[in-house]
């Protein structure tokens, strides 16, 4: 007796969602694993930082995206290990067998050997990062209104975007 092929997709970003959608109409069981329970639309994070959009406008629940697909299961777990020889994925809560594995975990920052920069910059890759930047900008603007030191005000109102 043959079973339906099991596909595990690690990552709920653009690549993971694209792969999962492509497999939604096939006779396979798809397990989408991501450490977040939502897809984050990163191209609009700058609008969260600017206060134009709310976080819920750029974070779409993964289960909602695939609610109509009977062959897709979404799990909010973090992958700890992959054993390719036994075709098994180990998460912080479970272990899963697979026939096919798609790794779509996205990208990371590159500070080009200058990792010390991390402590001095704001990044726009997460909701937390966007909200930290928004709060920093608001704090700087408010502080600039109450200072009488022109040089301090100039610093408070100076931002570099790279």
Tell what function each PLM region has.
Residues 1-4, 72-160:
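FAD-binding core/adjacent interface of flavoenzyme oxidoreductases
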Residues 2-72, 154-155, 160-161:
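Beta1-alpha1 glycine-rich phosphate/pyrophosphate-binding loop at the start
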């Amino acid at each position: 007796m043959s079973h339906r092929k099991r596909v595990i997709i690690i990552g709920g970003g653009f690549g993971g969602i694209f792969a999962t959608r492509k497999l939604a109409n096939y006779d396979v069981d798809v397990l989408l694993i991501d450490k977040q329970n939502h897809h984050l639309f990163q191209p609009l994070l700058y609008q969260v930082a600017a206060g134009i959009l709310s976080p819920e406008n750029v974070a779409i629940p993964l289960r909602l995206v695939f609610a109509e697909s009977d062959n897709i299961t979404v799990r909010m777990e973090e992958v700890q290990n992959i054993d390719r020889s036994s075709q098994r994925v180990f998460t912080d809560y479970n272990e899963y067998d697979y026939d096919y594995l798609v790794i779509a975990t996205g990208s990371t920052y590159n500070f080009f050997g200058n990792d010390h920069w991390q402590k001095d910059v704001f990044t726009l890759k997460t909701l937390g990062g966007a909200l930290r930047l928004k709060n920093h900008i608001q704090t700087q603007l408010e502080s600039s209104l109450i200072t009488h030191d022109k040089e301090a005000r100039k610093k408070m109102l100076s931002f570099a975007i790279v």
